[in-house]
């Protein structure tokens, strides 16, 4: 188990394919898109990471639990918390849905469970063999979905 808070990051480069028509042939290749590049805190060992974190949230903790669960927690000046969690296929989690508004939506073509309560909003879905979750303090449904939809594979 590793847990620490650090402001150091590494930059994830994002590329877009280009195609240029030259008449008899079309050249294709990759071009770096610096506008889409984003930072990932050092110590993050998961395969996925959100490219969008709401303004004002700063990393307070990065954890690796037995190589099965990867967590990163953020906090803003209002003491509101945001957590992104990635679990391997060998891990399992429970979501408190008692007295919650629960519905299903789609994220990246996968079914996502959304649970909204007065004190907690959770969005959980899978990407390949990983279960991903975004957890927000309070009824932060719109922000939680925006963070979830921004998650991309980085490894």
Where are these regions (language model features)?
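Long alpha-helical scaffolds
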Residues: 1, 5, 112, 148-152
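Surface-exposed amphipathic alpha-helical segments
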Residues: 128-155
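Short, solvent-exposed recognition patches
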Residues: 33-122, 126-127
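Generic detector of well-ordered secondary structure
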Residues: 13-16, 59, 153
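Intrinsically disordered, low-complexity repeat and linker tracts
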Residues: 29-30, 155
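Membrane-interface helical sensory segment of bacterial ECF anti-sigma factor regulators
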Residues: 1-29
